[in-house]
């Protein structure tokens, strides 16, 4: 979904009209909350349309492990207009205590992280418009909820207890 998120951010900055977008179920590490877009099966998709009177062209290029999207077209927005997108966290949900799953294949007392926990979040994305550096507009684009998830560890069997050694008492 990093591909979809990258395209979404290009579409936002070009100020194209987003007609469908869903967030990931949990926060992702490569963008701030509410700056993401997910695709999955037939139930999550990213759709947008050209709301300008002139054609646009969006090019995607891959070089090594880097994907770049570039939007081309005639910029019909007023000169001096800039936009900024601000992620605002409205609340968080603690993931709770980690889950421990017994794994007899591990050494006694061993503990191996299977998955990291995620803090749940509620966030929104603001679009802020500036004309010659002066804020002229601000709107909420969307509000999103991200699930919390507990960390999961596999744990080996309990370490065997060592019997206590008692010293014989001295004769009295």
Residue positions per predicted region:
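Well-ordered beta-sheet/strand-loop patches within structured domains
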Residues: 2-172
């Amino acid at each position: 979904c990093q591909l979809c998120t990258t395209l979404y951010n290009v579409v936002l900055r070009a100020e194209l009209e987003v007609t469908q977008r869903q967030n990931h179920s949990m926060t992702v590490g490569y963008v701030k909350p509410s700056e993401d877009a997910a695709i999955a099966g037939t139930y999550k998709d990213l759709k947008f349309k050209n709301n300008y009177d002139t054609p646009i062209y969006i090019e995607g290029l891959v070089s090594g492990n880097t994907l770049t999207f570039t939007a081309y077209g005639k910029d019909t927005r007023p000169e001096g207009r800039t936009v900024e997108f601000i992620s605002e966290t409205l609340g968080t949900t603690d993931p709770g205590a980690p889950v421990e799953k017994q794994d007899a294949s591990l050494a006694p007392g061993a503990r191996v992280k299977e998955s990291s926990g995620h803090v749940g979040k509620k966030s929104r994305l603001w679009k802020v418009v500036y004309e010659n550096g002066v804020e002229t507009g601000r709107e909420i684009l969307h509000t999103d909820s991200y699930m919390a998830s507990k960390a999961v560890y596999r744990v080996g069997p309990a370490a065997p207890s060592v019997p206590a050694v008692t010293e014989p008492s001295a004769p009295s």
